[in-house]
Amino acid sequence: MAEPWGNELASAAARGDLEQLTSLLQNNVNVNAQNGFGRTALQVMKLGNPEIARRLLLRGANPDLKDRTGFAVIHDAARAGFLDTLQTLLEFQADVNIEDNEGNLPLHLAAKEGHLRVVEFLVKHTASNVGHRNHKGDTACDLARLYGRNEVVSLMQANGAGGATNLQ
C-alpha cells in the first residue's frame, strides 16, 4: 500500500515533471514516501534528469535507501550510465561503496555495462573500492573483462584498478 503522496511524488519524478514535483514538495510531503510498488520518488525518478534528484535530495531524500531488489539509486545511475545524476547523488553523500544484493558496488555495474565515463569518474574522483569483490568473487575489472568491455579494462588497469583477477 502506498504511503500518503507516495504515488503522486513518484509519478512526477518518473515523468521528470519538475513543476508538479516542486508543487508537491512545497506541501511538506514525506520525500521518502513509498509508492504502491514500495519505491520512493528518488528510486523511480527519470535518471537523465539530475535536477529532479537535486530537488528531492535538497528536501531530505535518502540516496542510500534500497528497493526490494537491493538497488540504491546510485546503482541504477551507474548501471544506466548517467554520470550527471551519479555526480549529483554523490554531492549529497550517497555511499559510493554501497553493495547491492549480489555484493556489487556501483563501479561493478558501470564496468559490466561498459560505461567508460562513469567508470573513469568513479576510479579517479571517488573513494570507490576498486578491489572490492562481489559475492561471486569478481572485481569490477573482472566483470568488464568477462563482458568484453576492453576500454574499461584498459582504463582500470592504467589507473591501478586492474589488479588480481578471478578470470586469469
UniProtKB/Swiss-Prot annotation:
One Pfam short name: Ank_4
Domain of life: Eukaryota
ANK repeats: 4-33, 37-65, 69-98, 102-132
Gene Ontology biological process terms from the UniProt entry: negative regulation of cell growth; negative regulation of cell population proliferation; negative regulation of stem cell proliferation; oligodendrocyte differentiation; regulation of G1/S transition of mitotic cell cycle; stem cell proliferation
GO MF, any single term: protein kinase binding
Record key words, sorted: ANK repeat, Cell cycle, Repeat
Family: Belongs to the CDKN2 cyclin-dependent kinase inhibitor family.
Protein name, per record: Cyclin-dependent kinase 4 inhibitor C
Gene it is expressed from: CDKN2C
